Amino acid sequence: MTDNLQSFESISQVGKTETKKPSDPLQAEYEEGKKYLANEEYGQAAVALHNALVGFKEKNDEVGIANASNQLGHVCLARKEYENALQHYLQALAICEKSNDRMSILAVMKKIVTVRTHLKKYDEALADCLTILDHYQDNRDPQGTVTILEEMAEVYIKAGKKEKAADAYRTIASIHKNFRHDNIAAKFLEKAVQLTSES
């Protein structure tokens, strides 16, 4: 018999967890900002996250700076303050690249693509898409490849480059065909045909 039994105090209902407040006031401010953001209270989220960002900068806490900048980017994106969103995302991206955090780099870059598309900086958005695409292809990630190719097609359409968007859709169809997803492949080929007939 073992003595390594879980104490009764630590057992709770499934899905029910106690939310403990972080002991660090900066982290508490950051978490509060995230809650405001989740509740679409963007003004309060911006204040809390900005305060956390200032505090993280004073402590030279790069992880905190990256996280707060990323969340502030989300707030600005939701408020359609695209230039501010871009600045926050670029700050987060620089820190993620410095620490070589590949997953965070991809997540932030996808947001940067969205922001640059809203700003009609299509060439920059497409360059970022190609960087993301390289990562997915290097890691042999067909799902990620398809997702970013769809994003590229949308950017091409907004940029008025329908033929390139059609090429992206044909590439997506080819990937799906390789995995015997014939119905999905047919839908993307149809999108490509529609775009080329509109050109």
Q: Predicted segment positions?
A:
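Intrinsically disordered, low-complexity regions
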Residues: M1-S199
